[in-house]
Every structure is written in C-alpha cells, then in structure tokens.
Design a protein with these regions (language model features):
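Conserved N-terminal glycine/acidic-rich loop preference
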Residues: 273
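Nucleotide/pyrophosphate-binding catalytic subdomain
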Residues: 1-267, 276, 280, 287-288
C-alpha cells in the first residue's frame, strides 16, 4: 500500500532496500544472533529496535535479546533512598541494591520488552540468568579495594533453556542476573552476559547497542572496522575508555564463536537492520 504523496522514485527505493537486504537474509537465516540492549539505549526509538528484532525472527533468524537497565536501576535506588555507588564503572551491589536490580530487570524492564514485542507481532519469553540456571557465576569480590557485594563474573553458561525458547520460534529476553553457587543472585555486566551467551550458543553475530555512534579512534573519528590488536592499542592509549572498554572486551571475547561483533548506536532508528542487512552498516564491526 502506497500513500497518495509517495513518488515512483520513493517506491522504487523501497524495493531496492528489500533487494539489498536479501543476500544478508539468506546468509543469516537459521543463525543465532545475540543482541544486547543497554539501559542508555532504551529511548524514543525502542519500538523501532524491537520491530527490527521481530523482523529478524520472521525472516528465519534466531535473535536472543539481553538487556541491562543501569539508568533505571539508579533511578529506583534514589526513589528508595539508596545512593548509587560505582567503582571503575561497576555498581556496588549490596543486599538492598540487589533487590532493586532484580525488581527493575525482571519485574519491570523485562516484562515491558516482552509486552512490546508481543504488541509488535512477535513472540517472546522473559528470562533471567537464574532461570535454568542459565548463568552460573562467582562473586567478583573487590575492585580497587572496595567490596562490590553481589557483583558476579560468569563461570558457566547453560545454553539449553535459551535454545529451548529459540526452538519454539520465540525470542528470549534475558536479564543480566546470574546464580551463585551459594544460591544468591548476582548482578552481572550485561555486555559480558551477551558475549558469554554468544559463545555458548555458537552465535553468528554479537550486537551491542549503546548510546554513542560506535568506537572512536585516537583522532576522534568513528572506526568502522576494529581488529583486536588495534583495540588493545586504543585501550592502552586511552582513546577507548570508560564504559566502552567492557563493550570492546565483550566484543573481542565473543569472537571465540561469532564471525564478527558489532557496536552500534541504539539511538538511530532501525540501526540493527542497517548494521546487519546493508553493505555499509552504521557502527563499529569488531573482528580478529
């Protein structure tokens, strides 16, 4: 269906977009893609992103969605009289803070994402790394002399619960919480969770959505393709810093399984499709 004001050139361009995507759809059909949605990227274009995820499922791909929720967790901490504290970018997670993490990720953000996917025509199942359990973790312990509390590092991934959801034709929506051997829940970096899941699932792609264009080099320009050696140099020089460091390290870790990792700007409408189904892409592709 076209609109009365739509020109023939615009209609032809729509068809050309579909034709351009066809080789990529053929290449990735039946393949697993792990996509991490950060809290900072959950903005006005969230529905456009979720439409992309639903479309990928409909054309035969197997998307897995991992979500964080840092800004929302901090917001609820403050509402409940708890002061957010960070050490080297890691949230200090005492008992009350862990309760907030679980409440926000599994009681608010996860269900909202699942509901939006259903509204957009897809089928999704909300999960936590505790379910199955999917993510077995160990306490991270201290950072810079500070006790991080219930912050975990992934020890083992059980991919079976996620694969079962994928085999049903549904989209797993996974909160970045893991289960410790002590039976306690732990807060785990969502980039790390996505990378470890990508390896365990033998995924073809890992995509990390963030709120910047991608990785920038020493000259401040966007790096379209980043290899491991260059990434190490940029981290050592300080060109890659702050929250981008764990993203790049996660992207590199996933290369044990995936053909390429991608760090893209979640604020750009349909950035996921642009990165995966067009020749040029819109972010940084990380390769060996």
């Amino acid at each position: 269906m076209t609109t009365p004001s739509e020109t023939m050139e615009e209609r032809i361009r729509r068809a050309e977009v579909l034709v351009e995507a066809l080789p990529y759809i053929r290449r990735f059909s039946g393949h697993t893609l792990v996509i991490k949605l950060g809290g900072a990227a959950m903005g006005e274009d969230l529905d456009a992103f979720l439409q992309d995820v639903v479309l990928l499922r409909f054309v035969g791909m197997r998307p897995v969605l991992v979500h964080g929720g840092g800004p929302e967790i901090s917001l609820w901490q403050k509402r409940l009289g708890l002061e957010p504290r960070f050490v080297n970018g890691l949230r200090v997670t005492d008992g009350p803070t862990m309760d907030v993490v679980k409440m926000v990720l599994t009681g608010k953000i996860g269900p909202e994402l699942v509901a939006r996917i259903h509204t957009l025509g897809g089928q999704a199942v909300g999960m936590s790394g505790e379910d199955g359990p999917t993510l077995m973790v160990r306490p991270r312990g201290t950072e810079g002399g500070h006790d991080l509390g219930f912050v975990g590092e992934v020890d083992q991934v059980n991919a079976e619960p996620v694969e079962a959801v994928l085999d049903q034709g549904r989209i797993p929506v996974i909160a970045s919480i893991g289960l410790g051997v002590d039976g306690d829940a732990y807060n785990v970096n969502a980039d790390t969770v996505a990378a470890e899941l990508a390896v365990a699932l033998r995924a073809t792609k890992l995509v990390l959505l963030t709120d910047v264009e991608g990785v920038r080099g020493a000259d401040g320009e966007l790096v379209s393709v980043l290899d491991a050696a260059t990434a190490d140099r940029l981290i050592e020089s300080g060109a890659i810093s702050g929250g981008m460091i764990p993203k790049v390290r996660a992207a590199l870790r996933a290369l044990d399984a995936v053909t390429a990792s991608h760090i893209i700007d979640g604020r750009v409408s349909h950035s996921l499709l642009l990165e995966l189904l067009t020749e040029k892409g819109v972010g940084t592709m990380v390769t060996r």
